[in-house]
Curated annotation (Swiss-Prot):
Keyword Signal: yes
Gene3D superfamilies associated with the record: YVTN repeat-like/Quinoprotein amine dehydrogenase (2.130.10.10)
Subunit note: Monomer.
Gene Ontology cellular component list: outer membrane-bounded periplasmic space
Inducing stimuli: Repressed by Fur.
Top-level taxon of origin: Bacteria
Gene Ontology molecular function, alphabetical: DNA binding
Pfam families, per database record: YNCE
Record's keyword terms, sorted: Signal
Cleavable signal peptide: 1-30
Note: Preliminary crystallization indicates the presence of a single beta-propeller domain that contains 7 4-stranded beta-sheets.
Name listed for the protein in its UniProt record: Uncharacterized protein YncE
Length: 353
């Protein structure tokens, strides 16, 4: 009995030590895989530059206390702030022209767009996109998503409202070239296939709209689901090589994969209601933020299955990728309401893929 008891005690001790080592190993791996840093209040979209080796974050700051906002330049490895660019207008949406190294930020509440030199942080110019004064009857359209065509130095900006538009801006002189009309209710989603000369937008009418960027005319519009349910296709990201679009729905627990040639649905990926989506051609994966669930999903673009989930409380918002596709960045918002603003700054998470 004594020998058996001694053996059992040693065995239990070995198993406990082994379990602790495994847990420690997983914890260390998780810590190496994910870095989280508090940056500033009102965090929204990001832009990454390989040339400048930097990540920029648009923040609107406090709704009540701050008139303007701040664009933070971050070290993409440590997430430390290396520059704070103060603006009198609040920035929300973000993109970058990698050829001209010009950052573009949508000033949603002012119906404007601001161009900033990525190298210096100097404001290059600003353009008011809808100069109508807000009244009870008039609601100026608000810029939401931005995409830059490096080849033509053109910036496309979704202007959302009951009947949305897409503004087409000359990146050289920062002037409005044209506005593509009738893109539906709240056409928030925006994605560009520069080589194919196609621009895609999605809206709260449940449509995918295809636009020819050669003449800025709508080529087609298709209601993606005819199931009698409400859908808000809020964001879109392209796999241009395989002519696929990954589309998030804030009203349904699924992500759609759509053939961009005809609008046919290739797959429905089960996932919580979604916000941002970003396709990574280097890994053939798509990343999706689930604002209410507080998670980020990794979708295998071959099997159309969620293969990994990251816990990113409280409200994961926007996504950005490093140029090599090996690092994912997530902006994460704290709980905040109109009555009670968040007391702590919002975060940026760096995930090693």
């Amino acid at each position: 009995m004594h020998l058996r008891h001694l053996f059992s005690s040693r065995l239990r001790g070995s198993l406990l030590l082994g379990s602790l080592l495994v847990v420690s190993s997983f914890s260390t791996q998780a810590a190496e895989e994910m870095l989280r840093k508090a940056v500033g209040k009102g965090a929204y979209e990001m832009a990454y530059s390989q040339q400048e080796n930097a990540l920029w974050l648009a923040t609107s700051q406090s709704r009540k206390l701050d008139k303007g906002g701040v664009v933070y330049r971050l070290d993409p490895v440590t997430l430390e702030v290396t520059q704070a660019i103060h603006n009198d207008l609040k920035p929300f949406g973000a993109t970058i022209n990698n050829t001209t190294q010009t950052l573009w930020f949508g000033n949603t509440v002012n119906s404007a767009v601001t161009a900033i030199d990525a190298k210096t942080g100097e404001v290059k110019g600003r353009l008011v996109l809808d100069d109508r004064k807000r009244t009870e009857e008039v609601r100026p359209l608000q810029p939401r998503e931005l995409v830059a065509d490096d080849a033509t130095n053109t910036v496309y900006i979704s202007g959302i409202g009951k009947e949305s538009v897409i503004w087409v801006v000359d990146g050289g002189n920062i002037k409005l070239k044209t506005a593509i009309q009738n893109t539906g209710k709240m056409s928030t989603g925006l994605a560009l296939d520069s080589e194919g000369k196609r621009l895609y937008t999605t809206n709260a009418d449940g449509e995918l709209i295809t636009i020819d960027t050669a003449d800025n005319k709508i080529l087609s519009r298709k209601k993606l689901l005819d199931d009698g349910k409400e859908h808000f296709f809020i964001n879109i990201s392209l796999d241009t090589a395989r002519q696929r679009a990954f589309i998030t729905d804030s009203k349904a627990a699924e992500v759609l994969v759509v053939d961009t040639r005809n609008g046919n649905i290739l797959a429905k990926v089960a996932a919580p209601e979604s916000l941002a989506v970003l396709f990574n051609p280097a890994r053939n994966e798509a990343y999706v933020t689930h604002r209410q669930a507080g998670k980020v999903s990794v979708i295998d673009a071959k099997s159309y299955k969620v293969v990994k989930t990251f816990d990113t409380p409280t409200h994961p918002n926007s996504l950005a990728l490093s140029a090599d596709g090996k690092t994912l960045y997530v902006s994460v918002k704290q709980k905040s309401t109109k009555q009670q603003e968040a007391t702590q700054p919002d975060d940026v998470i760096r995930i090693a893929l």
